[in-house]
Amino acid sequence: MDMQGKIALVTAAASGAGRAGARILAREGAAVAVVDQNEAGAKAVVDEIKRGGGRALALGGDLRDDGFSRDIVAATVKEFGALDCVWNHLGIPGPSVIDDLEGWDLSVDLNLRSQLITTNAALAEMTARRKGSILFTASTSGLVGSPWSPTYSAAKAGVIGLARALAKRHAKDGVRVNAICPGAIDTPMLRVFVNRPDQPGHNEADPEELIKAAVTRNPMGRAARPEEIAEVAVFLLSDKASFVTGIAMPVDGGTVA
């Protein structure tokens, strides 16, 4: 997946699949804006990329801030001169109850609204140049619904709908828009989620048993490695997927097959 000369922006890129994606993009020749609320973590990823001879920029801030969600696009263009690819990877689990309206607002703000704002700013740049690729991280929960987190399912279903609508709207502008729908990913967030007191089967003494239970619905019997999600993401962002737009691709070991 040759990304030589491309300029990419990745959110939630200080750890997990986002970090893996930033590293792969850089390895394939792209300059990468690494965005994360954990600014120190973003800088660590940038340092790693630069040590490998790549170009990268760390942008730390809270994507619930509309101004920051827009400004990361301008900062990327200012640093590298253009923007070719955006991976909206940010996502957080929502509450397991449906009457937690504060939790609902937070889930929608981070899982959907912030991605829309960043995407709008990116589209202005991409449509002017008549080329670009945008990717959203949705979830299998957005495809089939999760009884453990209805607010997360609703927000991620919104992400899928947004990706499909924008794909149709901007195909004529040379911009492709897709979504990936991971299942369980082996990251610290998975452990935090399954071990929350409000989750069914909560058992603080043995979180690994909860992880095991979380992936039993997966025919492959395990969670994805972050790199397995990131490789698919980079493919969809790349010119190798030049005729692919408007899809919501499960990357889930067969969970929704």
Give, region by region, the residue ranges found by the protein language model:
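C-terminal substrate-recognition "lid" of short-chain dehydrogenase/reductases
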Residues: 2, 80, 116, 123, ...
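Canonical Rossmann dinucleotide-binding motif of NAD(H)/NADP(H)-dependent dehydrogenases/reductases
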Residues: 3-33
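Conserved NAD(P)H cofactor-binding loop of Rossmann-fold oxidoreductase domains
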Residues: 89-94
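Substrate-binding pocket helix/loop in short-chain dehydrogenase/reductase
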Residues: 95-108, 214
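Active-site helix of classical SDR
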Residues: 119, 155, 163
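Residue(s) in the substrate-gating loop at a strand-loop-helix junction
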Residues: 139
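Short, small/polar-rich loop/turn modules that mediate ligand/substrate recognition or access, typified
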Residues: 171, 176, 244-246
